[in-house]
Swiss-Prot record:
GO terms for molecular function: coenzyme F420-0:L-glutamate ligase activity; coenzyme F420-1:gamma-L-glutamate ligase activity; GTP binding; metal ion binding. Its EC number is 6.3.2.31, 6.3.2.34. HAMAP family: F420_ligase_CofE (MF_01258). A divalent metal cation 1 binds at D113, D150. Catalyzes the GTP-dependent successive addition of two or more gamma-linked L-glutamates to the L-lactyl phosphodiester of 7,8-didemethyl-8-hydroxy-5-deazariboflavin (F420-0) to form coenzyme F420-0-glutamyl-glutamate (F420-2) or polyglutamated F420 derivatives. InterPro entries: F420-0_g-glutamyl_ligase, F420-0_gamma-glut_ligase-dom, F420_ligase_CofE_arc. This is Coenzyme F420:L-glutamate ligase. It catalyses: oxidized coenzyme F420-0 + GTP + L-glutamate = oxidized coenzyme F420-1 + GDP + phosphate + H(+); oxidized coenzyme F420-1 + GTP + L-glutamate = oxidized coenzyme F420-2 + GDP + phosphate + H(+). The gene is cofE. Gene3D superfamilies: CofE-like (3.30.1330.100), CofE-like domain (3.90.1660.10). It comes from Halobacterium salinarum (strain ATCC 700922 / JCM 11081 / NRC-1).
Length: 253
């Protein structure tokens, strides 16, 4: 397996055909997985916004005041309102906003970006990244998989890594349960988050900052003769970390 960046992509504007732009610059073959950064998907889909578009309600005012108390920095309640509107749940409101987005992804600030925004104040995540991935896949001639990626922090460890927000043309996970390890023992719990691993691979190749490349092709990845699964995001009743966070309050300030 190897991965390479798709070079020469222009700055993406609303209405741009990402599939066509990729196809013009990459000689894709059947079985490739095309990993596309959510930032360019959002730009192509016109998911930019100005803070003035968000009128803060009482909850946003409360969150902004609380964050200002905790961090010692002034917080814009309009940004808090944008996060509330883009989230399905605010899991934590201090010392930062941890949210669930409409696609099921849990991250900070509903994934709203204030860098690489193409001149806008805010760049919102794609509304339905799985549908975004399917549209890109449909526009490519080769039989490929597509993963819409983002960078995200993680609990218990420093640093960010690439994760999948939406995907098409391949299962989300590879299920090893029922197979055996090298000692002949049956595997009982191993379900491998394939699309996240592909997203992390792409993130290593694409890089960050002004040298970043938003599209990476992973070639000769083989899913193998395994069961697949579309389950990537935990249901709340089995997500014990989220349940614990719901009952937790930050008491640092």
């Amino acid at each position: 397996m190897h991965a390479f960046a798709v070079d020469g992509l222009p700055e993406i504007d609303a209405g741009d055909d990402l599939a066509a732009l990729v196809a013009e610059r990459a000689d894709l073959t059947d079985g490739d997985v095309v990993c596309v950064a959510s930032t360019v998907v959002s730009k192509a889909e016109g998911r930019t916004a100005a803070l003035a578009e968000f009128t803060p309600g009482p909850r946003a005012e409360e969150i902004a005041a609380r964050l200002a108390d905790v961090t010692g920095e002034q917080k814009d309640p309009r940004f808090a309102q944008a996060v509330i509107e883009e989230a399905t749940e605010v899991i934590m409101d201090a010392p930062f906003l941890l949210t669930e987005t409409t696609c099921g992804h849990v991250g900070v600030n509903a994934g709203i970006d204030r860098s690489n925004t193409g001149g806008a104040e805010l760049l919102l995540l794609p509304k339905r990244p799985a549908e975004s991935a399917a549209r890109i896949q449909a526009g490519l001639a080769a039989d490929v998989g597509v993963v819409v990626t983002d960078t995200s922090g993680r609990p218990f460890r420093h640093g960010q890594r690439g994760v999948a927000l939406g995907w098409a043309g391949l299962p989300a996970a590879r299920d090893w349960r029922g197979e055996t390890d090298r000692d002949g023992h049956e595997l009982a719990v191993t379900v491998e988050a394939v699309v996240d691993e592909l997203a992390a691979t792409a993130n290593l190749v694409s890089g960050e900052g002004d040298d970043g490349t938003p599209v990476v092709v992973v070639r000769e990845f083989e899913f193998g003769d395994h069961d697949g699964s579309e389950q990537l995001f935990r249901a709340v009743d089995g997500d014990f970390v989220r349940q614990a966070l719901r009952g937790w309050t930050f008491d640092g300030a």
